[in-house]
């Protein structure tokens, strides 16, 4: 089979993409409209930022104002996420064409031209930027910061083992939410930094888990990432990020004087939820991590298996690391 034939991939089918006209569907796919989890991951930090702002404000903020800001920031995040996906695919087109999971995307298979993808990126950023009309000027600066790092991300995987660090820009949702409500992040600098680091470490952890499925092919193609760099200790990295993110969230609660419900529901819920996810992704073959987690997470989370317990795993990992040293 020739290389040309290998690249002739069938586009993904799904209930959401089937709703679009065949001429528009590739653009919807490029924007990841059919991947709803991505919208949640990009929108929830802004909602968390609004809730955090309301909890630390010295004056009570009307619920109508909170809902209004949450709506505007959610709209911005939706356009930001779609624009980032299109831009990332445009820059990575040559790399995606060499990886089995991504070579059927619209740009590698020729369903969308690079020029149209660039125009779509600009249009999406412009549409998202329209919400700034209804927000304080400081939010425009926040928007520019987030956009800069979103545009930088796809270049990082060519030059550094830590491109996921740029994804921490999603944590800038916290100061942007504070600015949208007229609060000064510098007045609560330490807890704000903790919330920024909390969201940033969660995003890095999720991306590392997701990137793991392409590790073998990334090595061949030359794509750099933390999943590739720490491929021999990926679980140690994941659990470390989980502990760090939990610590940052708890510290923010301590510094702002939040009550017991916050620590039980928010901090405890975060730790337990991602603990379940990490246990579900402890599989032998990295290529199956995504589907394995999706279909087997409940079973693997509560199934007692000594070989996947955290203590046993940490001991074995530490022993292996010391042996390599």
Swiss-Prot record:
Keywords linked to the UniProt accession: Magnesium, Membrane, Transferase, Transmembrane, Transmembrane helix
Organism (species): Penicillium rubens (strain ATCC 28089 / DSM 1075 / NRRL 1951 / Wisconsin 54-1255)
One BP term from GO: ubiquinone biosynthetic process
Gene3D superfamilies: UbiA prenyltransferase (1.20.120.1780)
Protein name stated in the entry: Prenytransferase adrG
Record field: catalytic activity: 3,5-dimethylorsellinate + (2E,6E)-farnesyl diphosphate = (3R)-3-farnesyl-6-hydroxy-2,3,5-trimethyl-4-oxocyclohexa-1,5-diene-1-carboxylate + diphosphate + H(+)
InterPro entries: Prenyltransferase, UbiA_prenyltransferase, UbiA_sf
Coiled coil: none
């Amino acid at each position: 089979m020739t290389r040309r034939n290998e690249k002739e991939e069938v586009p993904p089918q799904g209930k959401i993409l089937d709703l679009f006209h065949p001429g528009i569907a590739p653009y919807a796919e490029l924007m990841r409209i059919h991947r709803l989890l991505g919208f949640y991951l990009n929108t929830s930090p802004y909602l968390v930022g609004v809730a955090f702002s309301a909890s630390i404000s010295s004056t009570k903020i009307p619920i109508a104002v909170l809902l209004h800001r949450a709506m505007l920031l959610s709209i911005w995040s939706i356009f930001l996420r779609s624009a980032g996906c299109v831009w990332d695919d445009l820059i990575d087109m040559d790399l995606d064409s060499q990886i089995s999971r991504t070579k059927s995307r619209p740009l590698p298979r020729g369903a969308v031209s690079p020029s149209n993808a660039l125009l779509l990126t600009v249009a999406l950023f412009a549409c998202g930027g329209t919400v700034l009309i209804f927000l304080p000027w400081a939010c425009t600066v926040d928007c520019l910061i987030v956009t800069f790092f979103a545009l930088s991300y796809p270049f990082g995987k060519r030059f550094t083992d830590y491109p996921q660090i740029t994804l921490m820009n999603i944590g800038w949702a916290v100061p942007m939410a504070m600015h949208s409500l007229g609060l000064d992040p510098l007045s609560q600098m330490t807890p704000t930094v903790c919330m920024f680091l909390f969201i940033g470490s969660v995003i890095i952890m999720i991306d590392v888990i997701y990137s793991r499925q392409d590790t073998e092919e990334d090595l061949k193609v030359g794509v750099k990432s933390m999943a590739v760099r720490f491929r021999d200790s990926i679980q140690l990295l994941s659990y470390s990020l989980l502990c760090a993110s939990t610590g940052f969230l708890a510290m923010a609660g301590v510094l702002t004087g939040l009550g017991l419900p916050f620590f039980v529901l928010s901090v405890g819920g975060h730790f337990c939820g991602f603990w379940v996810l990490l246990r579900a992704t402890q599989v032998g073959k990295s290529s199956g991590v995504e589907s394995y987690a999706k279909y087997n997470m409940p079973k693997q989370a509560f199934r007692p298996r000594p070989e996947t317990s955290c203590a046993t795993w940490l001991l074995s990992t530490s022993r292996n690391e010391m042996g390599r040293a």
